[in-house]
Amino acid sequence: MFEKYPGKMEGLFRHNPYMAFPPAVPGLPPGLPPAVSFGSLQGAFQPKNTNPELPPRLGPVLSGLPQKGTQIPDHFRPPLRKPGKWCAMHVRVAYMILRHQEKMKGDSHKLDFRNDLLPCLPGPYGALPPGQELSHPASLFTATGAVHAAANPFTTAPGAHGPFLSPSTHIDPFGRPTSFASLAALSNGAFGGLGSPTFNSSAVFAQKESPGAPPAFASPPDPWGRLHRSPLAFPAWVRPPETARTPGSDKERPMERREPSVTKEEKDRDLPFSRPQLRVSPATPKARAGEEGARPAKESVRVKEERKEEAAAAAAAAAAAAAAAAAAAAAAAATTGPQGLHLLLERPRPPPFLGPSLPERCAGFPEPTWLAGPPRLARPPRFYEAGEELTGPGAMAAARLYSLDPAHPLLYSRLAPPPPPTATPGTPHLLSKTPPGALLGAPPPLVPAPRPSSPPRAPGPARADR
Protein backbone atom coordinates (compact mmCIF):
# COMPACT_ATOMS: atom_id res chain seq x y z
CA MET A 1 0.00 0.00 0.00
CA PHE A 2 2.87 2.36 0.74
CA GLU A 3 4.44 1.89 -2.71
CA LYS A 4 1.85 4.24 -4.24
CA TYR A 5 3.23 7.26 -2.46
CA PRO A 6 6.63 8.59 -3.41
CA GLY A 7 9.19 9.64 -0.94
CA LYS A 8 10.49 8.11 2.22
CA MET A 9 8.41 7.89 5.38
CA GLU A 10 10.52 8.71 8.34
CA GLY A 11 9.62 7.82 11.88
CA LEU A 12 8.73 10.48 14.39
CA PHE A 13 10.88 8.96 17.09
CA ARG A 14 14.22 9.04 15.25
CA HIS A 15 14.74 12.76 15.11
CA ASN A 16 13.21 15.87 16.59
CA PRO A 17 11.09 17.60 13.89
CA TYR A 18 10.84 20.80 15.93
CA MET A 19 13.43 23.52 15.95
CA ALA A 20 14.74 24.79 19.23
CA PHE A 21 13.40 28.19 20.14
CA PRO A 22 15.42 30.40 22.47
CA PRO A 23 13.49 31.26 25.64
CA ALA A 24 12.32 34.79 26.29
CA VAL A 25 13.13 34.55 30.02
CA PRO A 26 16.65 33.41 30.92
CA GLY A 27 16.77 30.24 33.00
CA LEU A 28 13.86 28.44 31.30
CA PRO A 29 14.48 25.45 28.99
CA PRO A 30 14.06 26.07 25.28
CA GLY A 31 10.56 25.43 23.93
CA LEU A 32 8.69 25.22 20.66
CA PRO A 33 8.55 28.15 18.22
CA PRO A 34 5.34 30.19 18.31
CA ALA A 35 4.21 28.97 14.87
CA VAL A 36 5.20 25.50 13.68
CA SER A 37 4.37 24.34 10.19
CA PHE A 38 3.06 20.77 10.18
CA GLY A 39 3.42 20.38 6.42
CA SER A 40 6.60 18.31 6.82
CA LEU A 41 5.00 15.84 9.24
CA GLN A 42 3.70 13.02 7.07
CA GLY A 43 1.73 10.28 8.75
CA ALA A 44 1.07 6.74 7.54
CA PHE A 45 -2.12 7.73 5.68
CA GLN A 46 -1.12 11.28 4.70
CA PRO A 47 0.85 11.18 1.39
CA LYS A 48 3.01 14.01 0.29
CA ASN A 49 1.47 16.36 -2.19
CA THR A 50 3.51 16.10 -5.40
CA ASN A 51 0.98 17.71 -7.73
CA PRO A 52 2.03 21.34 -8.23
CA GLU A 53 -1.44 22.36 -9.42
CA LEU A 54 -3.25 21.43 -6.16
CA PRO A 55 -2.45 23.57 -3.14
CA PRO A 56 -1.37 21.77 0.00
CA ARG A 57 -3.79 21.55 2.96
CA LEU A 58 -1.57 23.11 5.56
CA GLY A 59 0.94 24.70 3.22
CA PRO A 60 1.53 28.34 2.37
CA VAL A 61 -1.02 30.66 0.75
CA LEU A 62 -1.61 30.61 -3.01
CA SER A 63 0.82 32.64 -5.06
CA GLY A 64 -1.92 34.72 -6.67
CA LEU A 65 -3.05 36.20 -3.32
CA PRO A 66 -1.07 38.93 -1.60
CA GLN A 67 0.99 37.57 1.24
CA LYS A 68 1.15 39.35 4.58
CA GLY A 69 4.42 39.82 6.32
CA THR A 70 5.02 37.22 9.03
CA GLN A 71 8.12 38.76 10.48
CA ILE A 72 8.08 39.66 14.19
CA PRO A 73 8.79 43.30 14.99
CA ASP A 74 12.12 44.09 16.54
CA HIS A 75 10.73 45.37 19.82
CA PHE A 76 8.81 42.06 20.38
CA ARG A 77 11.59 39.75 19.23
CA PRO A 78 13.46 38.10 22.16
CA PRO A 79 17.22 38.54 22.31
CA LEU A 80 19.03 35.88 20.30
CA ARG A 81 21.68 33.72 21.91
CA LYS A 82 24.51 31.95 20.21
CA PRO A 83 23.95 28.21 19.94
CA GLY A 84 26.39 25.85 21.60
CA LYS A 85 26.35 27.25 25.12
CA TRP A 86 25.56 24.78 27.89
CA CYS A 87 24.20 25.71 31.26
CA ALA A 88 25.04 23.97 34.51
CA MET A 89 21.98 21.72 34.33
CA HIS A 90 22.96 20.45 30.88
CA VAL A 91 26.44 19.63 32.12
CA ARG A 92 25.07 17.77 35.16
CA VAL A 93 22.63 15.71 33.11
CA ALA A 94 25.32 14.82 30.55
CA TYR A 95 27.69 13.78 33.31
CA MET A 96 25.07 11.56 34.92
CA ILE A 97 24.23 9.93 31.59
CA LEU A 98 27.90 9.26 30.85
CA ARG A 99 28.45 7.80 34.29
CA HIS A 100 25.42 5.58 33.91
CA GLN A 101 26.60 4.27 30.55
CA GLU A 102 30.03 3.48 31.92
CA LYS A 103 28.54 1.60 34.84
CA MET A 104 26.20 -0.36 32.60
CA LYS A 105 29.20 -1.50 30.51
CA GLY A 106 30.90 -2.87 33.59
CA ASP A 107 27.79 -4.57 35.09
CA SER A 108 25.31 -5.15 32.30
CA HIS A 109 23.05 -7.68 34.12
CA LYS A 110 22.05 -5.21 36.81
CA LEU A 111 19.72 -2.26 36.52
CA ASP A 112 20.89 0.95 38.09
CA PHE A 113 18.05 2.83 39.73
CA ARG A 114 19.89 5.96 40.71
CA ASN A 115 18.85 7.79 43.84
CA ASP A 116 20.74 10.89 42.80
CA LEU A 117 18.44 11.23 39.78
CA LEU A 118 15.45 11.29 42.10
CA PRO A 119 16.80 12.80 45.30
CA CYS A 120 13.45 13.09 47.06
CA LEU A 121 10.26 11.20 46.26
CA PRO A 122 6.93 12.35 47.67
CA GLY A 123 5.39 9.97 50.13
CA PRO A 124 6.30 8.18 53.36
CA TYR A 125 8.55 5.60 51.70
CA GLY A 126 11.52 7.82 50.88
CA ALA A 127 14.06 7.27 48.12
CA LEU A 128 14.77 4.07 46.21
CA PRO A 129 17.56 1.73 47.36
CA PRO A 130 20.85 1.47 45.50
CA GLY A 131 20.92 -0.33 42.19
CA GLN A 132 22.89 -3.34 43.51
CA GLU A 133 19.92 -4.44 45.65
CA LEU A 134 17.55 -4.87 42.70
CA SER A 135 17.90 -7.98 40.61
CA HIS A 136 17.47 -8.28 36.87
CA PRO A 137 13.85 -7.97 35.67
CA ALA A 138 14.19 -11.29 33.88
CA SER A 139 14.42 -13.04 37.25
CA LEU A 140 11.17 -11.38 38.34
CA PHE A 141 9.05 -12.75 35.51
CA THR A 142 10.65 -16.14 34.79
CA ALA A 143 9.96 -19.47 36.40
CA THR A 144 13.59 -20.39 37.11
CA GLY A 145 15.04 -16.98 37.82
CA ALA A 146 18.05 -17.59 35.56
CA VAL A 147 20.19 -14.66 34.48
CA HIS A 148 20.68 -14.05 30.76
CA ALA A 149 23.26 -11.38 30.20
CA ALA A 150 22.93 -11.21 26.44
CA ALA A 151 19.14 -11.18 26.40
CA ASN A 152 16.97 -8.10 26.28
CA PRO A 153 16.39 -6.92 29.87
CA PHE A 154 12.65 -6.53 29.19
CA THR A 155 12.08 -9.98 27.68
CA THR A 156 11.55 -13.19 29.55
CA ALA A 157 13.32 -16.48 29.15
CA PRO A 158 11.86 -19.18 26.90
CA GLY A 159 11.13 -21.32 29.91
CA ALA A 160 8.81 -18.71 31.36
CA HIS A 161 5.97 -19.73 29.07
CA GLY A 162 6.13 -23.35 30.05
CA PRO A 163 3.63 -23.38 32.93
CA PHE A 164 1.03 -21.58 30.81
CA LEU A 165 1.26 -23.36 27.44
CA SER A 166 2.26 -26.91 28.39
CA PRO A 167 1.73 -27.57 32.07
CA SER A 168 3.88 -30.34 33.55
CA THR A 169 2.65 -33.28 35.52
CA HIS A 170 4.25 -32.33 38.83
CA ILE A 171 2.82 -28.76 38.81
CA ASP A 172 -0.78 -28.08 39.76
CA PRO A 173 -2.51 -26.37 36.80
CA PHE A 174 -4.53 -24.27 39.25
CA GLY A 175 -1.66 -23.61 41.58
CA ARG A 176 -0.04 -20.38 42.52
CA PRO A 177 1.88 -18.47 39.87
CA THR A 178 5.63 -18.91 40.05
CA SER A 179 6.32 -15.23 39.59
CA PHE A 180 5.69 -14.59 43.27
CA ALA A 181 8.60 -16.81 44.20
CA SER A 182 10.98 -14.66 42.18
CA LEU A 183 9.58 -11.48 43.68
CA ALA A 184 10.66 -12.74 47.08
CA ALA A 185 14.26 -12.10 46.09
CA LEU A 186 13.74 -8.38 46.47
CA SER A 187 15.28 -6.88 49.55
CA ASN A 188 13.34 -5.29 52.39
CA GLY A 189 14.27 -1.83 51.19
CA ALA A 190 13.01 -2.28 47.62
CA PHE A 191 10.13 0.02 46.68
CA GLY A 192 10.29 1.82 50.00
CA GLY A 193 10.07 -1.22 52.26
CA LEU A 194 7.37 -3.17 50.36
CA GLY A 195 9.52 -6.07 49.19
CA SER A 196 9.94 -9.49 50.74
CA PRO A 197 7.37 -9.36 53.61
CA THR A 198 4.49 -9.74 51.17
CA PHE A 199 6.09 -11.18 48.02
CA ASN A 200 7.37 -14.54 49.22
CA SER A 201 6.02 -17.91 48.18
CA SER A 202 4.58 -18.82 51.57
CA ALA A 203 3.33 -15.46 52.82
CA VAL A 204 1.22 -14.51 49.79
CA PHE A 205 -1.48 -17.11 50.49
CA ALA A 206 -0.45 -17.96 54.02
CA GLN A 207 -3.21 -16.11 55.86
CA LYS A 208 -6.14 -17.58 53.90
CA GLU A 209 -5.05 -21.06 52.80
CA SER A 210 -2.42 -22.38 55.19
CA PRO A 211 -2.41 -20.54 58.49
CA GLY A 212 -0.20 -23.18 60.11
CA ALA A 213 2.43 -23.40 57.40
CA PRO A 214 5.94 -22.29 58.43
CA PRO A 215 7.16 -19.12 56.72
CA ALA A 216 9.83 -19.47 54.07
CA PHE A 217 11.80 -16.41 55.14
CA ALA A 218 12.17 -14.83 58.52
CA SER A 219 10.81 -11.33 58.15
CA PRO A 220 9.92 -8.49 60.50
CA PRO A 221 6.22 -7.86 61.35
CA ASP A 222 4.03 -7.36 58.31
CA PRO A 223 3.90 -3.65 57.47
CA TRP A 224 0.59 -4.17 55.62
CA GLY A 225 -1.02 -5.33 58.84
CA ARG A 226 -1.18 -1.73 59.99
CA LEU A 227 -3.80 -1.02 57.32
CA HIS A 228 -6.18 -3.67 58.71
CA ARG A 229 -5.99 -2.57 62.31
CA SER A 230 -8.35 -0.05 63.83
CA PRO A 231 -6.87 3.38 64.57
CA LEU A 232 -6.06 4.46 68.10
CA ALA A 233 -8.76 7.14 68.06
CA PHE A 234 -11.50 4.46 67.89
CA PRO A 235 -10.76 1.73 70.46
CA ALA A 236 -12.26 -1.62 69.63
CA TRP A 237 -14.61 -3.49 71.94
CA VAL A 238 -12.62 -5.65 74.31
CA ARG A 239 -14.12 -9.10 74.59
CA PRO A 240 -13.59 -10.80 77.92
CA PRO A 241 -11.30 -13.83 77.85
CA GLU A 242 -12.67 -17.33 77.83
CA THR A 243 -11.54 -17.92 81.41
CA ALA A 244 -13.68 -15.07 82.68
CA ARG A 245 -16.80 -16.34 80.84
CA THR A 246 -17.66 -19.49 82.76
CA PRO A 247 -20.49 -21.77 81.65
CA GLY A 248 -22.55 -20.91 84.72
CA SER A 249 -22.29 -17.15 84.33
CA ASP A 250 -24.90 -17.04 81.54
CA LYS A 251 -27.39 -19.04 83.59
CA GLU A 252 -26.99 -16.92 86.71
CA ARG A 253 -28.14 -13.70 85.04
CA PRO A 254 -31.78 -14.78 84.38
CA MET A 255 -32.02 -16.07 87.95
CA GLU A 256 -30.88 -12.70 89.26
CA ARG A 257 -33.54 -11.00 87.16
CA ARG A 258 -36.29 -13.36 88.36
CA GLU A 259 -35.55 -12.90 92.04
CA PRO A 260 -36.94 -9.34 92.33
CA SER A 261 -40.19 -10.44 90.64
CA VAL A 262 -40.62 -13.34 93.09
CA THR A 263 -40.12 -11.08 96.06
CA LYS A 264 -42.66 -8.62 94.63
CA GLU A 265 -45.29 -11.36 94.32
CA GLU A 266 -44.71 -12.36 97.93
CA LYS A 267 -45.08 -8.75 99.05
CA ASP A 268 -48.34 -8.37 97.13
CA ARG A 269 -49.66 -11.57 98.65
CA ASP A 270 -48.82 -10.49 102.19
CA LEU A 271 -50.13 -6.96 101.68
CA PRO A 272 -53.72 -7.55 102.98
CA PHE A 273 -52.37 -8.90 106.28
CA SER A 274 -49.79 -6.16 106.72
CA ARG A 275 -52.27 -3.27 106.42
CA PRO A 276 -53.79 -1.99 109.68
CA GLN A 277 -57.55 -2.09 110.19
CA LEU A 278 -59.13 1.16 109.10
CA ARG A 279 -62.50 0.93 110.91
CA VAL A 280 -61.44 -0.09 114.36
CA SER A 281 -63.28 1.33 117.31
CA PRO A 282 -61.02 3.07 119.82
CA ALA A 283 -62.70 1.16 122.62
CA THR A 284 -61.89 -2.18 121.07
CA PRO A 285 -58.40 -3.35 122.03
CA LYS A 286 -56.18 -4.91 119.46
CA ALA A 287 -56.25 -8.66 119.31
CA ARG A 288 -53.21 -10.44 120.53
CA ALA A 289 -51.69 -13.62 119.30
CA GLY A 290 -53.85 -16.63 120.15
CA GLU A 291 -57.06 -14.64 120.58
CA GLU A 292 -60.02 -14.36 118.24
CA GLY A 293 -59.58 -11.83 115.44
CA ALA A 294 -55.82 -12.12 115.56
CA ARG A 295 -53.93 -12.27 112.29
CA PRO A 296 -53.24 -15.84 111.26
CA ALA A 297 -49.68 -16.96 111.04
CA LYS A 298 -47.87 -16.88 107.75
CA GLU A 299 -47.40 -20.62 107.73
CA SER A 300 -51.14 -21.28 108.06
CA VAL A 301 -52.02 -19.45 104.84
CA ARG A 302 -52.62 -21.82 102.00
CA VAL A 303 -51.68 -20.31 98.68
CA LYS A 304 -53.70 -22.75 96.56
CA GLU A 305 -56.94 -22.19 98.45
CA GLU A 306 -56.41 -18.44 98.29
CA ARG A 307 -55.96 -18.60 94.53
CA LYS A 308 -59.16 -20.66 94.21
CA GLU A 309 -61.07 -18.08 96.24
CA GLU A 310 -59.69 -15.27 94.09
CA ALA A 311 -60.74 -17.13 90.92
CA ALA A 312 -64.25 -17.70 92.28
CA ALA A 313 -64.58 -14.03 93.24
CA ALA A 314 -63.40 -12.95 89.79
CA ALA A 315 -65.93 -15.30 88.13
CA ALA A 316 -68.75 -13.93 90.28
CA ALA A 317 -67.76 -10.35 89.42
CA ALA A 318 -67.69 -11.21 85.72
CA ALA A 319 -71.17 -12.81 85.93
CA ALA A 320 -72.54 -9.74 87.71
CA ALA A 321 -71.02 -7.45 85.10
CA ALA A 322 -72.54 -9.55 82.30
CA ALA A 323 -75.98 -9.42 83.93
CA ALA A 324 -75.72 -5.64 84.36
CA ALA A 325 -74.69 -5.26 80.71
CA ALA A 326 -77.66 -7.40 79.59
CA ALA A 327 -80.07 -5.32 81.67
CA ALA A 328 -78.62 -2.09 80.25
CA ALA A 329 -78.98 -3.47 76.72
CA ALA A 330 -82.63 -4.41 77.34
CA ALA A 331 -83.36 -0.94 78.74
CA ALA A 332 -81.67 0.69 75.78
CA ALA A 333 -83.68 -1.49 73.36
CA ALA A 334 -86.89 -0.44 75.08
CA THR A 335 -86.10 3.26 74.75
CA THR A 336 -84.79 3.16 71.19
CA GLY A 337 -86.50 2.83 67.85
CA PRO A 338 -86.00 0.26 65.11
CA GLN A 339 -83.00 2.13 63.73
CA GLY A 340 -81.41 2.38 67.17
CA LEU A 341 -82.35 6.08 67.60
CA HIS A 342 -83.69 7.40 70.85
CA LEU A 343 -87.46 7.88 71.04
CA LEU A 344 -87.07 11.42 72.30
CA LEU A 345 -85.55 12.34 68.96
CA GLU A 346 -88.31 10.52 67.06
CA ARG A 347 -91.36 11.88 68.92
CA PRO A 348 -94.28 13.04 66.71
CA ARG A 349 -94.25 16.62 65.63
CA PRO A 350 -97.13 18.69 64.22
CA PRO A 351 -97.11 18.79 60.44
CA PRO A 352 -96.30 22.10 58.81
CA PHE A 353 -99.24 24.40 58.00
CA LEU A 354 -99.95 24.31 54.28
CA GLY A 355 -103.15 26.38 54.26
CA PRO A 356 -106.79 25.35 54.47
CA SER A 357 -107.79 22.08 52.96
CA LEU A 358 -109.72 21.80 49.74
CA PRO A 359 -113.19 21.34 51.35
CA GLU A 360 -112.64 24.35 53.58
CA ARG A 361 -111.70 26.46 50.60
CA CYS A 362 -114.88 25.39 48.76
CA ALA A 363 -117.19 25.97 51.77
CA GLY A 364 -116.15 29.57 52.32
CA PHE A 365 -114.13 31.63 54.73
CA PRO A 366 -114.96 31.38 58.43
CA GLU A 367 -115.91 34.52 60.31
CA PRO A 368 -113.51 35.93 62.87
CA THR A 369 -114.00 34.53 66.33
CA TRP A 370 -114.17 37.94 67.97
CA LEU A 371 -117.44 38.80 66.18
CA ALA A 372 -120.65 38.56 68.13
CA GLY A 373 -122.82 35.61 67.56
CA PRO A 374 -122.05 31.98 66.97
CA PRO A 375 -119.38 31.15 64.46
CA ARG A 376 -120.74 30.51 61.02
CA LEU A 377 -119.53 30.41 57.50
CA ALA A 378 -120.01 33.70 55.65
CA ARG A 379 -120.88 33.96 52.05
CA PRO A 380 -118.06 34.26 49.54
CA PRO A 381 -117.37 37.78 48.34
CA ARG A 382 -119.71 39.00 45.62
CA PHE A 383 -118.30 40.71 42.58
CA TYR A 384 -120.68 43.37 41.36
CA GLU A 385 -121.11 44.26 37.75
CA ALA A 386 -120.67 47.74 36.40
CA GLY A 387 -123.71 49.92 37.03
CA GLU A 388 -125.00 47.89 39.95
CA GLU A 389 -125.71 50.01 42.99
CA LEU A 390 -124.37 48.94 46.37
CA THR A 391 -127.43 49.84 48.37
CA GLY A 392 -129.45 48.11 50.95
CA PRO A 393 -128.37 45.50 53.43
CA GLY A 394 -126.13 43.80 50.92
CA ALA A 395 -123.63 46.64 51.10
CA MET A 396 -123.53 46.44 54.86
CA ALA A 397 -123.02 42.69 54.72
CA ALA A 398 -120.25 43.06 52.18
CA ALA A 399 -118.58 45.68 54.33
CA ARG A 400 -118.77 43.56 57.43
CA LEU A 401 -117.42 40.60 55.53
CA TYR A 402 -113.90 42.03 55.80
CA SER A 403 -114.47 43.44 59.31
CA LEU A 404 -114.70 47.00 58.00
CA ASP A 405 -117.13 49.65 59.13
CA PRO A 406 -119.14 51.39 56.43
CA ALA A 407 -117.48 54.52 55.09
CA HIS A 408 -118.73 57.80 56.44
CA PRO A 409 -120.15 60.00 53.66
CA LEU A 410 -118.50 63.13 55.01
CA LEU A 411 -114.98 61.65 55.37
CA TYR A 412 -114.77 59.39 52.34
CA SER A 413 -117.20 60.67 49.74
CA ARG A 414 -115.98 58.38 47.01
CA LEU A 415 -116.21 55.29 49.17
CA ALA A 416 -119.53 56.34 50.66
CA PRO A 417 -122.60 54.42 49.72
CA PRO A 418 -124.99 56.04 47.28
CA PRO A 419 -127.54 58.45 48.70
CA PRO A 420 -130.84 57.12 49.77
CA PRO A 421 -133.48 56.69 47.11
CA THR A 422 -135.38 59.65 48.53
CA ALA A 423 -133.13 61.95 46.47
CA THR A 424 -134.30 63.55 43.29
CA PRO A 425 -134.26 61.30 40.25
CA GLY A 426 -132.19 63.69 38.19
CA THR A 427 -129.22 63.62 40.57
CA PRO A 428 -126.32 61.78 38.95
CA HIS A 429 -124.83 58.86 40.80
CA LEU A 430 -121.37 57.37 40.48
CA LEU A 431 -122.51 53.84 39.67
CA SER A 432 -125.90 54.55 38.13
CA LYS A 433 -126.98 52.41 35.23
CA THR A 434 -128.18 55.31 33.11
CA PRO A 435 -125.58 58.07 33.05
CA PRO A 436 -126.72 61.50 31.87
CA GLY A 437 -126.52 62.15 28.15
CA ALA A 438 -124.51 65.37 28.61
CA LEU A 439 -121.59 63.40 29.97
CA LEU A 440 -121.67 61.01 27.03
CA GLY A 441 -122.13 63.59 24.24
CA ALA A 442 -119.37 65.99 25.26
CA PRO A 443 -115.86 65.18 23.94
CA PRO A 444 -113.24 64.34 26.48
CA PRO A 445 -111.31 67.42 27.50
CA LEU A 446 -107.87 65.79 27.25
CA VAL A 447 -108.24 64.50 23.68
CA PRO A 448 -107.35 67.26 21.14
CA ALA A 449 -109.48 67.91 18.07
CA PRO A 450 -108.38 66.06 14.93
CA ARG A 451 -106.28 68.09 12.47
CA PRO A 452 -105.94 67.55 8.75
CA SER A 453 -102.89 65.45 8.22
CA SER A 454 -100.50 65.78 5.29
CA PRO A 455 -100.91 63.27 2.46
CA PRO A 456 -98.61 60.27 2.61
CA ARG A 457 -95.40 60.54 0.66
CA ALA A 458 -94.94 58.26 -2.28
CA PRO A 459 -92.06 55.83 -1.97
CA GLY A 460 -89.08 57.11 -3.94
CA PRO A 461 -85.50 56.03 -4.53
CA ALA A 462 -83.38 55.61 -1.46
CA ARG A 463 -81.09 58.45 -0.64
CA ALA A 464 -77.34 57.98 -0.94
CA ASP A 465 -76.62 59.40 2.52
CA ARG A 466 -78.58 56.64 4.30
UniProtKB/Swiss-Prot annotation:
Modified residues (Phosphoserine): S281
Covalent cross-link (Glycyl lysine isopeptide (Lys-Gly) (interchain with G-Cter in SUMO2)), residues: K8
One GO molecular-function entry: growth factor activity
Keywords, ordered alphabetically: Isopeptide bond, Methylation, Phosphoprotein, Ubl conjugation
Coiled-coil zones: none
Disordered: annotated span: 236-315, 410-466
Pfam families named among the record's database cross-references: Auts2
A GO cellular component entry from the record: extracellular space
Comp. bias intervals (Pro residues): 442-459
A GO biological-process term: positive regulation of fibroblast proliferation
Keyword Protein transport set for record: no
Composition bias type Basic and acidic residues, residue spans: 248-272, 288-311
Modified residues (Asymmetric dimethylarginine): R229, R239
Protein name: Probable fibrosin-1
Record gene name: Fbrs
